[in-house]
Each structure stands twice: as structure tokens, then as C-alpha cells.
Amino acid sequence: DEEKVNFANALVGETKNISDITISVSIRLGGMVVFAGDEAGLKWLTEKLPKDDRFPLRLMHHAAFHSPLLQHIVPMARAQNPVTDFGPGSIPAIDGQGKIWSPHAFSADAIYAYTLGAQLTETYDFSRAVQVAAAEFAPDVVIVLGPGTTLGAPTAQALIASGWRGLSGKADFQARQQDEPILISMGMDEQRAWAER
């Protein structure tokens, strides 16, 4: 939803002029935005964000992931995980910027720099990763492994936003799920059975 993206970016921009708070977009998660921030920034956000049912919601143990607030972690992570721990890969991987890392087609230094750099300190665009996977690999069905069921809705929202397989909205997606599912969440017993057919 472009309106939400613009609103989130405007909030982050507004904080650039406030010296005692820090916020940034942590994760683009389907139709939701997850923010990262220091304590003062998160309090400020709670006051600024519109109230909607259960939102804004503060995630347990999530404050600074995928944000500049973790910049100090990068040297520690690299000290504990040398580049020699990174191999050529065996299946394609898509990162939080939507880049595909094809097996044997990238340097260990490059994936190391992303994994223990930008992945820690920059926005993780889950929506973009899902959209790139759907567009580039053209799956018959998208299977969400987990954890639990929390990624099903954001995955569906990302697919709808990109018009994957002609999806035009929530009602269209729900109707297609009834006839021949295109998204399976392994965290749901009844959907897990669809994947086992």
C-alpha cells in the first residue's frame, strides 16, 4: 500500500529533526510496516501512529533489528563468523533487498558483506523478497514454512500487491484459495495437508 509506505517514510523523515529519538523502517511486511527504534523513538511512534484495532503493536524482543541501531553489532558478528564460514550455496536465496543469490554465482565476500552488514543494519523488505521469488521462479504454489502462521497474510498481501497470477485483491485471493490454493501455510493443519497431496 503506497499510502502506508509514504506515511512510514514521512514519520522517519520527521524524526531526522528530533535529536533525542531514533526510528527507522525495520521490515516491510506485506501490508504492514515494522519500525525499529530506541525507547524514546518507539514511545514517539506509539503517539504518532493511528490506532487501529490492535495496532500499533509493540513486538516482544524487537527494537533495533534491520536498522542503523545495530551498526555496532557488525564488527562483533564478523569477528565471530569469518568469511570462510560462507560457502557457494546449494539453492537460490533471496535477500531482504530482493537480490537473488544463485548457487556458485556469487562471491563469498559479497554474501558475507550483505549477511553481516546490510541485513543487520538496513530495512528488510520481506514483501520485495516474496515478489521477486514469485516473479523469477514462477511457482505453482507458494508454501510458507513458518514460523507458525504469522507470515501467511504478509505473503498473500505481497503477492496481491504485485498482481501475481492476476490477483487483484483480498476477495479475489480468498476465492482462489477455496478452489485451488495458491498459498499454503504449513503452520495450519488443514493447509499442511494440501502440501502433502
Region locations from a protein language model:
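Short amphipathic alpha-helix segments
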Residues: 1-19
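A generic structural motif
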Residues: 31-37
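Short, solvent-exposed amphipathic alpha-helical segments in soluble enzyme
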Residues: 50-51, 110, 158-161
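Helix N-cap motif at beta-to-alpha junctions
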Residues: 37-44
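Short beta-strand
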Residues: 22-28, 58
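Acyltransferase
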Residues: 54-145, 150, 180-185, 191-196
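Hydrophobic side chains in well-ordered alpha-helices
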Residues: 44-45, 129
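Short acidic, glycine/proline-enriched helix-loop-strand junctions
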Residues: 151-190
